Amino acid sequence: MRLHLITVGEPKLAYARAGWDEYEKRLRRYHKVQVTRVGGRTGAQASEAIARAAGRAPLILLDPRGEQFTSESLSAYLDAQALDGRGELAFAVGGPEGHTDDLRARAHRLWSLSLLTLPHDLAMILLLEALYRAATISAGEPYHRGST
């Protein structure tokens, strides 16, 4: 399955760029990965750009109003989407203003990485690490050591 990762802007901090690069490389061993960076001076502009970038793919917005996954439940969700014949899922990290209500209404799902407020750069790394961890769980590989 192809995972389309959409972010507003580039990681700005060196640790974030390094983390993004590392987990993107790891994730590519399990999935086709497409990365799209969009711009937008306002939340509305960024949300419009995210919607255009996602196209017809089911859109999963990282949003504090969303549900939380365990690593195992994220793995199961991704496996179920693949079994249902979805060739692509789009995941979007919004900008500083978050997502618009219109984009939230269009989304296939809202996913909250944490109850904490996270810096944009850190949210991007957490997204990639969570997807990578889910892929290793599905593959039965030893990266994940949590309990099921």
Curated annotation (Swiss-Prot):
Assembly description: Homodimer.
Species lineage: Bacteria, Thermotogati, Deinococcota, Deinococci, Deinococcales
Origin species: Deinococcus geothermalis (strain DSM 11300 / CIP 105573 / AG-3a)
Cellular localisation: Cytoplasm
Catalytic activity annotation: pseudouridine(1915) in 23S rRNA + S-adenosyl-L-methionine = N(3)-methylpseudouridine(1915) in 23S rRNA + S-adenosyl-L-homocysteine + H(+)
Binding site for S-adenosyl-L-methionine: 62, 94, 113-118
GO molecular-function term, one example from the UniProt record: rRNA (pseudouridine-N3-)-methyltransferase activity
Enzyme Commission designation: 2.1.1.177
Protein name: Ribosomal RNA large subunit methyltransferase H
Major subcellular location class: cytoplasm
Keyword Nucleotide-binding: no
InterPro entries, per database record: Alpha/beta_knot_MTases, RlmH-like, tRNA_m1G_MTases_N
Gene Ontology annotations for the cellular component aspect, listed alphabetically: cytoplasm
Functional summary from the UniProt entry: Specifically methylates the pseudouridine at position 1915 (m3Psi1915) in 23S rRNA.
